[in-house]
Curated annotation (Swiss-Prot):
Keywords of this entry: Cell membrane, Membrane, Transmembrane, Transmembrane helix, Transport
InterPro entries: Pur-cyt_permease (IPR001248), Pur-cyt_permease_Fcy2/21/22 (IPR026030)
PANTHER family xref list: PURINE-CYTOSINE PERMEASE FCY2-RELATED
Membrane topology reported for the UniProt record: Multi-pass membrane protein
Keyword Membrane: yes
Protein name as catalogued: Putative purine-cytosine permease YxlA
Amino acid sequence: MKVERRTIEYIPNEERHGKAKDLFPVWFGANMHITTLVTGTIPVAMGLNLFWSVAAIICGTLIGAIFMASHSAQGPQLGIPQMIQSRAQFGVIGAILPLFLVMFIYLGFFASSTILAAGTLSSFVPIPGSWSIIGLSAVCFLLTIFGHDLIHKMQKILSWTSFAVFFAATILIFQLPIPAGSWIPGAIDLPIFLVAVSAVATWQLAYAPYVADYSRYLPVKTPASKTFWYSYAGTSVSSIWMMLLGALLTTSLPDFTANSGSQIVQLFGPFSFIMLIIVLFGQMAINVFNLYGAFMSTTTTLEPFLKLKVTPKVRIIMILGVTLVGTVLSLLGQSNFMELFLNFIFFISYFLIPWTAINLVDYYFVRHGKYQVKAMFDVNGPYGKVNWITTIAFVLSILLEIPFINTSFYIGPLAKMFGGGDIAWIIGLAVPSVLYYVLMKPRLKKRAGYQEKLSSL
C-alpha cells in the first residue's frame, strides 16, 4: 500500500479511478460502529418512547442524508476536497472561518469515538483507560498516513464483516425485554421530537465537510445522480440500523450508556472477542476518517499563507499534530462522556447547517456546478480573499439561531416560547439560503455582463 501523493490539489484525469458504487461500502462502513449506536440513544435519553425515538431516527437520517449526499455529488465534477470548494463562497482567506469550525468537529468526533473504544477495550483487557486512548490513537495515526485508498479498502472490509456480526447482534438485541407499551405511539412530545430529529440529522451533516474528499478520485464523467444515491443509501441504511439498535438497547438496559461498548460486546457471551474486534476496528476506521479530514482542513488553512508543499515528511508531521490534539481532547473528556457528546452534537449543528446551506445553494442554484478550480488556489483570483456577502450571511444566520437554541447549557427565549422546541436548524437552513442567493446571484450576473462587454471591445 502506497502513501497517497495528493492532498488538497486537483486530481488529474489520469489519476481518477473507481466507480460510484464504491461509495456505498465507504458510507455504509462509516456508520457501522458504536458512536453511531450511541447517537441512537439520544432520543430515548430525551424522554421519547421507543416508537417516537425510531421515528425521529428515521426522519433525521433521511433529511440529513440529502444534504450529505448532495455534497458527495460535487467530488467527481470538481476533483478537489470539499473545504477547498468553500473558497468559492467565502474567499480564499475567508474560508478559514468555516475551516476552524470543521477542524473542531473532526477532533470532537475523534475524541468521542476514541473514548468509546478505549472504554470498551479497558473493560476486557487490564489496561488503564488513558493508555487505551493513547494506544488506539497511535494506531489511527499510522493508518491515516496512507490516505485515501487505504481508507476505501478499510471501509469495504468493515462493511462486510460488521454486516455479519451486527446482523447477529440485532437478533440478540431484539430478544431483550423492553417495557410494555414501548412500541405504542401514544401522544407525541413535539418539542422534544424536533430536538431529537435535529440531533440525528446533525450526524449526517457532520459528514458534509469531507464527504466529497472520498468521491473526488472518481472519473469526472461519473453521473452526479449515481454519486448521490450510492452515498445516500450507504449512510442512511447503516445509520438507521445502528441508531435503532442504540434506541433498543437504551430502552432495554437503562445503564447502557454508562459503558455501551462493553455491554454490546457482552451480548455475545463466549464469542464476545469477535464483537470486541469489530467494535475496535469500527472505531479506528471512523477515526482515520476524522484524522484525514482534520489533516486536509489544516493543510487548506495553512496553504494560502505558506504555499505548502506537502511532502511525505510534512504529511506525517501534520497528521501527528492533529492526532496529538485529538488525543489530548480524548484524555480530558473521558470522565463525563455522554453529556459532553450530547452538547457537542447540538453545538456543531448551529454552525454546520448555515455552512451547508450556503455551499449547496452556491453549487446547485447560483453557479450550477461551474467553477474555476485553479482560481481557488489564487489569493488574488476571482474568488478574492474574503467574500463579505457570504461571511455576513453565515455569521448573521448563526446569530439568528441563538434565540431558538435548546441545550442543557442554554435555552433561547423563543425556544422557551415554543415549549422547548429547537427549530434553530430550520433558521440555519432558510436564512443563509435566501440571503446568499438574493445577494450573490445579482452580483455574479453583473460581473458576467461586465466581462462580456470587455470581450466585445
